[in-house]
Amino acid sequence: MKIKVGLIGFGRMGQMYWEEMQKSGRWDIAYICDTDPASRELARNLSPSSRIISDEQEIFDDQSVEAVGLFALANSRKEQIEKAVRSHKHILTEKPIADTIDKEWEIVDLIEKYDRIAAVNLYLRNSWYHQACLLY
């Protein structure tokens, strides 16, 4: 059974996630949301089976959507994560999870009590130990 997901943000990172989700075959990408008309047009061309929207609230309101992918700008993520929690969705978000450290800690506090999966895509390619591994 595929996981029904709505993607919010279809810029570079949203497109990369969309591509990997397509490859895996485990995802039903029901919605792609972006405020930019050019990004929505690209999404229509790349993902004709997805519903292309400009209002993210449709994703949160759709009870059949199990997960959200948050790939828009960091200044929108705290509110989006809060909406996802209120609507009982699993969360896959790009980093950072908010645009200030205080907001990030508020999200951490919220997510620690959450009964769904909440994952932050935190690339490790810049960490010292990853760089050391690449030398060998």
Which residues are covered by each model-predicted region?
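Beta-loop-alpha module in the N-terminal Rossmann-like domain of NAD(P)-dependent dehydrogenases
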Residues: Y17, S50-L110
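A contiguous active-site-proximal alpha/beta segment in oxidoreductase catalytic domains
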Residues: A98-Y136
